Amino acid sequence: MAFCIWMTGLPCSGKTTIVRKLTENIPNLAILDGDELREWLSPKNFSKEARDEHQFKVAHLAKLLLKHNVPMGVSTISPYKANRAKAREIIGDDTKFFEVYVNASLAQCEERDVKGMYAKARSGEIKGFTGIDDPYEAPDNADLVLDTENKSLDESAAEVLEFLKSKNLL
């Protein structure tokens, strides 16, 4: 059965790692990674307009995949509440779209950052970086909240699997 797990959270909160772990139990899960998609789908800058455009393109791609019965995990920062609401509207069907908030503190995310993106943002080398000089608006009503600050990424992936089972999607 097709579904869209829309992972949102600060950079380095664990979104992509969790989605990749899900493929161990859901082999046909498509992964729509925001960083990878940005390389060829959207503008390379991090302006509000570029982020909006990127989110809408990812949402339309997810809608197309759902139409063809492809289950997917979308791993994208999705920093703005309005954009996540728009993604839900574009994709439609609340029985198949689930917003998952991957919650970790800014300090924890900076500690996990192997690419040095936070350091570049703090030094001013990168502008508009979420959590540093651009806000992240945490969801008020996510379908599932994962606490990756206090739980391992394996435990978090297991929570997603249990959630999907509770919805009779696995």
Spans of model-derived segments:
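The conserved Walker
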Residues: 11
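Hydrophobic anchor at the beta1->P-loop junction of P-loop NTPases
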Residues: 7
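ATP-dependent NMP and nucleoside kinases share a basic, alpha-helical "lid"
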Residues: 45, 62-68, 77-121, 128
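Small-molecule kinase domains that catalyze NTP-dependent phosphoryl transfer to phosphate-bearing small molecules
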Residues: 103-106, 111-159, 167-170
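Conserved substrate/cofactor phosphate-moiety recognition/catalytic segment
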Residues: 19-60
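Walker A (P-loop) ATP-phosphate-binding motif of ABC ATPase nucleotide-binding domains
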Residues: 4
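Short beta-strand segments at enzyme active-site cores
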Residues: 31-34, 69-77
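Conserved lysine of the Walker
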Residues: 15
